[in-house]
């Protein structure tokens, strides 16, 4: 077994480590994905209430863009913000924001990380934003989360 690992590391290249996936890797069901997304929204609204802000309403339009962008980021392994013009036009919104996260194991940890980042925190607490859509996509053993915020 040691020889196989050595050969694999030599084939991949120096400095890279290759590990085998566990025999039964965790794959969340559609229910756990929906539950993760719902928990992100609930946690964001809890934080907003704590800071005297109104709740955000879950909305199909920012959700549609969160789902498509989250799937793209998870599938490609890339990680960057999309151009907000797409959401502004597609949702007929006057304002839009986006938060991204990858690698956090729970919705609560995801939102806590956003609250520790000034730009992401600003989106969560922005009084002018009224709608939210969230995507949570589990691939390659980790969650990729996209939250899109809009104001019509």
Predicted regions and their residues:
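Secretory targeting and sorting signals
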Residues: 1-25
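Functional surface patches built around histidine and acidic residues
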Residues: 21-152
């Amino acid at each position: 077994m040691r020889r196989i690992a050595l050969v694999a590391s030599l084939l991949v290249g120096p400095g890279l480590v290759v590990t085998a996936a566990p025999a039964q890797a965790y794959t969340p069901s559609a229910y756990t994905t929906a539950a993760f997304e719902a928990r992100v929204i609930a946690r964001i609204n809890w934080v907003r209430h704590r800071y005297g802000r109104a709740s955000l309403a879950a909305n199909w339009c920012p959700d549609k863009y969160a789902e498509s962008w989250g799937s793209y980021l998870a599938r490609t392994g890339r990680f960057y913000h999309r151009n907000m013009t797409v959401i502004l036009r597609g949702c007929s919104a006057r304002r839009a924001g986006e938060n991204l996260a990858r690698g956090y194991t729970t919705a609560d940890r995801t939102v806590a990380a956003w609250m520790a980042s000034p730009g992401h925190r600003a989106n969560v607490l922005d009084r002018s934003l009224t709608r939210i859509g969230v995507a949570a996509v589990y691939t390659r053993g980790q969650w990729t989360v996209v939250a899109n915020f809009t104001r019509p």
